Regions:
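Short, membrane-interfacial amphipathic segments enriched in basic
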Residues: 1-6, 163, 167
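Membrane-interacting alpha-helical segments
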Residues: 2-9, 13, 153, 222-225
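Membrane-interface helix starts
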Residues: 10-26, 184
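Membrane-helix interface segments
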Residues: 17-18, 99-105, 182-186
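Secretory targeting signals
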Residues: 28-80, 105-181, 209, 213-261
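Aromatic-anchored segments of alpha-helical transmembrane domains
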Residues: 28-34, 192-202
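Transmembrane helix boundary and interhelical loop/hinge segments in multi-pass membrane proteins
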Residues: 77-101
């Protein structure tokens, strides 16, 4: 398996798709930071004190699996993985004596590395540019779809959940890419699932805030979504109000955090095991 992973790293260094994705991610990060920076410059003229282009704002916003680069990563991973089958790379690995178990788990490991390398580069550049233009304050304000101050606890919690979420997305992507082995149908399936998980959590969170207006059946349904959606807390972290100051702040409760950690680990294990079992039974042409 070590040799298979080394072969993946060697191919990745020469892969045009990976390089193009890195360039696109860099361009998107620079473009986003510049847009927010110039908006901040314009808002200075109307006495708007809050900054949009800050390290903490870009950190939180860049983690979303539903934003432009978050969706580009699984699309490119699908292409990369399907080519392993269509170009005969997987078949050659079997011919040279590698077991299907080693091959599939090397695909999983390679997919995770592929995904995390791209996301670390993108998020790191976003945070770096935001920090240069507007500073980074671990207790500062985040401006976006949800506004509020952050804390070091919130930042590390959402960072851990994002890490697990992208590992889950990578494993799910490898599952469908190795099962379908065709880019055409695989891309919409994966993207639709990501959007359902992400926006399903957002909608469920908004509806849950209605409280007593909802009936018991709807409350139970929304609670079930919370426990089965692997992207729930990443999409639906709450904006709380400090009763003493009236200021809003972003928070992920310990219960929600550990629910999502366990949830993601279960999904990762299920897709890995299911994909491995299916891969062992299918012929590779």
């Amino acid at each position: 398996m070590r040799n298979l992973f080394k072969a993946f790293i060697f191919r990745l260094r020469k892969d045009l798709t990976f390089r193009i994705t890195l360039i696109v991610g860099g361009a998107l990060a620079v473009g986003l930071a510049l847009i927010l920076f110039f908006i901040d410059l314009g808002l200075k003229n109307v006495d708007f004190d809050m900054k949009l282009c800050t390290g903490q704002t870009l950190f939180v916003s860049s983690l979303s699996p539903a934003q432009n680069f978050g969706l580009a990563v699984p699309i490119n991973l699908i292409t990369f993985t399907v080519l392993e089958f269509t170009q005969g790379t997987i078949r050659n690995k079997i011919i040279t004596g590698n077991s299907k178990t080693k091959i599939y788990f090397s695909l999983i490991l390679s997919g995770i590395v592929f995904t995390l390398l791209l996301m670390f580069a993108y998020v790191g550049l976003c945070v770096g540019l935001g920090s240069i233009f507007g500073g980074f304050d671990p207790h500062g304000m985040v401006m976006g779809l949800v506004n509020g101050t952050v804390s070091p606890e919130f930042l590390w919690k959402i960072g851990v959940l994002a890490l697990l979420a992208y590992i889950f997305i990578a494993v799910m992507t490898i599952f469908f890419a190795s099962l379908i082995r065709n880019v055409g149908p695989c891309i919409p399936i994966v993207i639709i699932l990501i959007m359902i998980f992400y926006f399903g959590g957002t909608i469920a969170s908004v509806m849950s805030a209605l409280g007593e207006i909802l009936g018991d059946g709807m409350k139970n349904f929304l609670l079930a979504i919370k426990y089965i959606d692997p992207l729930y807390s990443l999409a639906a972290f709450s904006s709380e109000v400090d009763p003493n100051t009236g200021a809003s702040y972003l928070a992920i409760s310990n219960a929600d955090f550990w629910t999502e950690v366990i949830n993601n680990l279960i999904y990762i294990a299920a897709f890995t095991l299911g994909g491995w079992l299916l891969f062992r039974k299918r012929d590779v042409k």
